[in-house]
Amino acid sequence: MAPADLASEGPKLEDPPAPHLFGKCPSGLIMANVETLPVRADPGRDPLLAFAPRPAELGPPDPRLTMGSVGGGVTHAQEFPMKSVGTRTGGGGSQGSFPGPRSSGSGTNRERPGPGRYPSEDKVLANSLYLNGELRGSDHTDVCGNVVGSSGGSSSSGGSDKAPPQYREPNHPPKLLTTSGKLDQCSEPLVRPSAFKPVVPKNFHSMQNLCPPQTNGTPEGRQGPAGLKGGLEKSRTMTPAGGSGGGGLSDSGRNSLTSLPTYSSSYSQHLAPLSASTSHINRIGTPGYSSGGGGGGSGYQDLGTSDSGRASSKSGSSSSMGRSGHLGSGEGGNGGLPFAACSPPSPSALIQELEERLWEKEQEVAALRRSQEQSEAAVAQVLEERQKAWERELAELRQGCSGKLQQVARRAQRAQQGLQLQVLRLQQDKKQLQEEAAQLIRQREELEDKVAACQKEQADFLPRMEETKWEVCQKAGEISLLKQQLKDSQADVSQKLSEIVGLRSQLREGRASLREKEEQLLSLRDSFGSKQASLELSEGELPPACLKPALTPVDLVEPQEALASCESDEAKMRRQAGVAAAASLVSVDGEVDAGGEGGTRALRREVGRLQAELAAERRARERQGASFAEERRVWLEEKEKVIEYQKQLQLSYVEMYQRNQQLERRLRERGAAGGSRTPTPQHGEEEKAWTPSRLERIESTEI
């Protein structure tokens, strides 16, 4: 897996390392690998400054040069020194500023190729991450033929197109790939790797013997921190190289650590050439000169660093870091350095130095092996404890899950039984509802039939209702007319009754007067009998001359009766009463005047008058009855006329209605023939054709 792929994946929960170094590594151990890169000087720096004499004493190390190392997780690991020789140019500028970002130097005489030229960037580096900065593409070669960066770093190998192990693309920012996990379950204090612990740098005393120290008036402490900033970065713990099976020790890119192979269980990694160390040593004796343009710039620096993060312990880890020795420093002004600063070392010294460095590397490899074995034992112990804890947790989880499964099964069984009961109830309810629905459908059909029959009967009853309405209207008119006639008749009857009452009163009065007259007549008859007897006696005594016939009152009454026939009843009665009174007065007077002679005649006249009055009264009653009969006949004739008129009016109304119906029917037929639609009556509202019914007999109420 490529570093870019590892960086892009981010943190992983479970990513066990390769088993050829640590066996089975638990996920709780965080492994990190930090590789440092050399500090390159300004690309415009003259490479002849590498032969400036180094100072006599070294100042205190810059705190930024402390390099952290990652221990292998072994307590009380043996610390071992490592001497490494490296040459690098100081980041000297005209003002002694700090160098730029660090980058690795690849051992070729030409400039570093671009990022796309290295085919080894796809190499699998498991659980490895580089924390160095971006690459700088400006390199140049010094007089020894080595590639020197902007901060003085030179490569140790030449002519290789492969990128160094710490090479990283600029578009992939550094990320820390961790493997998660915790060691909570372990009761004992476990051995864990300590990442990024400070390391005490050590000076390379063997390199001081190669060239005599010279000072140019400026100690190292005053030269600025630019020369001390060379490729010291935080280191990481060693990690397996993934599926390739070979693990390598990561160096800062300038020392011989990248030249020597690291420990591998398969012993398949070959030894890299020792060109880095030889090139660094060969450059020591080469004369150099300073650039004339820079004032106060530092000379050629030799900073050697080694990644010793693989032999650190739990309490503290130590790493051997090469000292930074200045071969020369520039003066404060524009003055240059002497060209022949030091003499080249002898081959025996070089061989001795190489043997010492080789011995140091062997010691380092042995220490790394011991630390690896101890770390493997610790890791195995931790893994066993973790496995035991995991087994206990698994057993507890199984037990808990089995109990939960049983509970869930019981709940599911109870729920299933409840659901079955609900299903049975719902099925019964469904059957009952279906039966009720069928019954309701039957009832609905019956009701629809009844409604249809009722609508049909209603349609049949409509013309009858119309006829009945017309008859009711006719009867109402007749009743109103008869009521009016009744009112008139009642008024006439009341008038007649009043007249009858008046006549009855007059009759009573006449009867009373008649009784009186009869009584008077009886009394007069009695007196007449007595008078007649006395008269007969006296007639025999009187002479015949006195017995002349005189005018009787009867002769006077006859013309009066002829005149009275033309008068009314009341007038007649009044006249008769007056006549009777006058006659009575006359008779009384005659009786008084004539004495007994005219008494009989007066009585006769009175009797005749009363008989005439009775005959007149009878004739008046007969005339009144005839007038009543005539009035009744006239009223009946008028009634018949009114009834006939109502009949004709009703018949005319019926004929008018029939004509209107016929006209509407003709209009509908013509509209249907012309294409116009008329709204059809709905069911139950169809109007049947009205059949003209003849009013055979119309009865009216008789009064």
Curated annotation (Swiss-Prot):
Changing I703 to A/G/V: Abolishes interaction with SHANK3. Residues 96-107, 251-268, 304-324 have a biased composition (Low complexity). Detected in brain, with highest expression in brain cortex, caudate putamen, cerebellum and hippocampus. Detected in neuropil (at protein level). Detected in brain and kidney. It is found in: Synapse; Postsynaptic density; Cell projection, Dendritic spine; Cell projection, Dendrite. It holds the Pfam family Fez1. Residues 109-124, 683-703 have a biased composition (Basic and acidic residues). InterPro entries: LZTS. GO terms for molecular function: PDZ domain binding. Residues 348-526, 600-669 form a coiled coil. Interacts (via C-terminus) with SHANK3 (via PDZ domain). Interacts (via coiled coil) with SIPA1L1. Can form homooligomers. Belongs to the LZTS3 family. May be involved in promoting the maturation of dendritic spines, probably via regulating SIPA1L1 levels at the postsynaptic density of synapses. This is Leucine zipper putative tumor suppressor 3. It comes from Rattus norvegicus. The gene is Lzts3.
